[in-house]
Amino acid sequence: MSEKHPGPLVVEGKLADAERMKLESNYLRGTIAEDLNDGLTGGFKGDNFLLIRFHGMYQQDDRDIRAERAEQKLEPRHAMLLRCRLPGGVITTRQWQAIDKFAAENTIYGSIRLTNRQTFQFHGILKKNVKPVHQMLHSVGLDALATANDMNRNVLCTSNPYESELHAEAYEWAKKISEHLLPRTRAYAEIWLDQEKVATTDEEPILGQTYLPRKFKTTVVIPPQNDIDLHANDMNFVAVAENGKLVGFNLLVGGGLSIEHGNKKTYARTASEFGYLPLEHTLAVAEAVVTTQRDWGNRTDRKNAKTKYTLERVGVETFKAEVERRAGIKFEPIRPYEFTGRGDRIGWVKGIDNKWHLTLFIENGRILDYPGRPLKTGLLEIAKIHKGEFRITANQNLIIAGVPESQKAKIEKLARNHGLMNAVTSQRENSMACVSFPTCPLAMAEAERFLPTFVDKVDALMTHHGVSDEHIVLRVTGCPNGCGRAMLAEVGLVGKAPGRYNLHLGGNRIGTRIPRMFKENITEPEILASLDELIGRWVKEREAGEGFGDFTVRAGIIRPVLDPARDFWE
């Protein structure tokens, strides 16, 4: 994209303060251990507020009661979000029972939140329960290491591919990549698991003493499903199979969706194709991409620090050549691949060995016992009898995987009795939101709490126009950081202020095109009025099989984003 304007390999200038914090942290220890014992505050102070992110936690507070507590001269009700490391979203039923118990007994909200990065989060962990949550995870073979901040985050892997044999191989690679790129510091084990300090000096051969310039996200994807939304990620391994066996990967680098309102130096970007590599080079290439970004990423401006900006600054070919040099390989030409969809296949799907997979739609990924729909209890009951595993999907749903024919009826009965298989519209299945209020400190507008009733209204429009059995990929994100992946939707809403959103149009169903802003800072009635008109036109004027996003581009309603570094804001 940007070979015309190659810039410096390293950005000189005053380093961002986060770089000082990492350097002085003694490999991510800081004074977290001492801070844990400070009962005068429910939060972590100073650098520790940011350092705990490397340990998989964010400090939050309940924004619904923030003003009320301030009036009472009380500090905000601090509580932690904890995000588990769960490559490929695979979790055993024993592990599920442990996290269910912890959520019920030791969190403010009592829920498990499935995320669109294939893991789960606990919201509302008080400071006194922070150490116990890490110890509980460790006791069942899990951890929260490197699920936030400037590291390689949770590695995604296609959940329910059409060829299940490939899933086992791809999942193993997702785990290997995750383990290979983990930090080597013993800080996590010392602070949370009470393991002894070792006399040897810490070293970080891959990540370095100041870790990465910014967050880094990786996927393993099995076409034709793009359920993991590869273009939202820094590094993507697209599976290439021959005769049903995995033989290598196409590598795509430099995707990312977060922007800052009004900051023209920020933009969403799809990933660039680097080439094909045989399986045996996977870890060397993963390491080479990460270390190139480690050394060349912008450490002076965190808003321009992600891999997508490094690629645009130095040029795709320059970055690719450096990866080849470090990995000691030459990429082969990209092998053919195509995507046909990215939604989950809700309901039963037959896999190999006569085993079945049941994908359950979980609205917003929020697992809780609702009136008449005790979802959390239902999943616990299934976990008690299911001998296979659960898989969390990148669409915030849950798969009961590996069900033998003999257990199928029993598991389906439990699911139906607990409201886990209630019929929902295609539109609802293809709509998604991030958490946003009340817990996210960055939220500008509602997302998770807004989505269910908003989808009711979109469903009414779809019915009115005679397309109630069809869908538009709809995403709502509460702020421009973009966790809801609205920047890969056919209709994307990006929070601007309470009750107000920027409306983006022109993405496509398979998630390979960035949508452009259509209207700025508008209310729900204004959004619905626009959609009413546009859905009406789509139904009347579309070509056979043409999705809503493709139609808005072809009809000239919105110009496609072709080169985001230059035309995203036009």
UniProtKB/Swiss-Prot annotation:
Pfam families: NIR_SIR (PF01077), NIR_SIR_ferr (PF03460). GO terms for cellular component: sulfite reductase complex (NADPH). It catalyses: hydrogen sulfide + 3 NADP(+) + 3 H2O = sulfite + 3 NADPH + 4 H(+). Keywords: 4Fe-4S, Amino-acid biosynthesis, Cysteine biosynthesis, Heme, Iron, Iron-sulfur, Metal-binding, NADP, Oxidoreductase. Binds 1 siroheme per subunit. Binds 1 [4Fe-4S] cluster per subunit. The keyword GTP-binding does not apply. Siroheme binds at residue 483. Pathway: Sulfur metabolism; hydrogen sulfide biosynthesis; hydrogen sulfide from sulfite (NADPH route): step 1/1. GO terms for biological process: cysteine biosynthetic process; hydrogen sulfide biosynthetic process; sulfate assimilation. It is an enzyme of class 1 (oxidoreductase). Its cofactor is siroheme; [4Fe-4S] cluster. [4Fe-4S] cluster binds at residues 434, 440, 479, 483. InterPro entries: CysI (IPR011786), NiRdtase/SiRdtase_haem-b_fer (IPR005117), Nit/Sulf_reduc_fer-like_dom_sf (IPR036136), NO2/SO3_Rdtase_4Fe4S_dom (IPR006067), NO2/SO3_Rdtase_4Fe4S_prot (IPR045169), NO2/SO3_Rdtase_4Fe4S_sf (IPR045854), NO2/SO3_Rdtase_FeS/sirohaem_BS (IPR006066). GO terms for molecular function: 4 iron, 4 sulfur cluster binding; heme binding; metal ion binding; NADP binding; sulfite reductase (ferredoxin) activity; sulfite reductase (NADPH) activity. Its EC number is 1.8.1.2. Alpha(8)-beta(8). The alpha component is a flavoprotein, the beta component is a hemoprotein. NCBIfam families: CysI (TIGR02041), PRK13504.1 (NF010029). Component of the sulfite reductase complex that catalyzes the 6-electron reduction of sulfite to sulfide. This is one of several activities required for the biosynthesis of L-cysteine from sulfate. Belongs to the nitrite and sulfite reductase 4Fe-4S domain family. PANTHER family: SULFITE REDUCTASE [NADPH] SUBUNIT BETA, SULFITE REDUCTASE [NADPH] SUBUNIT BETA-RELATED. This is Sulfite reductase [NADPH] hemoprotein beta-component. It comes from Citrobacter koseri (strain ATCC BAA-895 / CDC 4225-83 / SGSC4696). The gene is cysI.
